[in-house]
């Protein structure tokens, strides 16, 4: 099947789980993780951050995967979808009427009214996007691999310790403890909607709902991301979606991550159409890009989908990414 994207939608949101020290490196500090989704999409659309004059990086200075998505999928129209971000981006976006996610250890992730609104509006948006054909859906939500684990466990899947991390050192014990604390507080919720309300975040149900709408309109939904997309696919399935119509695209770094189990999770949920971008940054002249080969970042902002598409077009992805990397660091150093 030809999976050339007609449009690339990036769904953003936040969860207070990202404020737990050590849970994520998708931001230079825990507090800055609430800015990461806004900065990601501002950079993706404009080539520079707007809300803060800071390119989103890990604590080790490795830049956002939005750099890769922007560099290699430059010719694909982009759409920002706000599912519930604490910091709203200063670029145009579609608002699904959700709310930022809470700390699932302390209380519900969101109100069920907000989750229902996300499902309704997301599905409506998906039906419109589906008329275009192939729709790639990426995400930006620091802490999302932890809430993804919670969603999957809440829906009855064995996801313990199987979701990935933006860090080379996956904090699996900490993530599992957060999920255990959330389950102790909420008990196993009785239905999928309650699972999302109690244990999730705004992004995963939004991804699922948009994908469902795309499929209903005759389009092809492509979840472009890592282990978090197992949770989105599980919600899609629980909403009545046909998994035969759903595709998932990710990076080689996610598939090869020994601290997680991307392929196993996809198989357990029932996703059959899995595609992997085989790009390597091992020969890059830049340490920040070679770090990807050591397990840094791995996915995010639809990077796997962008790489998969670019490689299918025969593009020299490393050359494109290095050129964008050079431009970004000139901007960082000179403010130009």
Curated annotation (Swiss-Prot):
- Which InterPro entries does this one have? Nict_dMeBzImd_PRibTrfase, Nict_dMeBzImd_PRibTrfase_arc, Nict_dMeBzImd_PRibTrfase_sf
CDD domains the record matches: DMB-PRT_CobT
Q: Which GO terms describe its molecular function?
A: nicotinate-nucleotide-dimethylbenzimidazole phosphoribosyltransferase activity
Q: Which Gene3D superfamilies match?
A: 3.40.50.10210
Member of which family? Belongs to the UPF0284 family.
Q: What is this protein called?
A: UPF0284 protein Pcal_1534
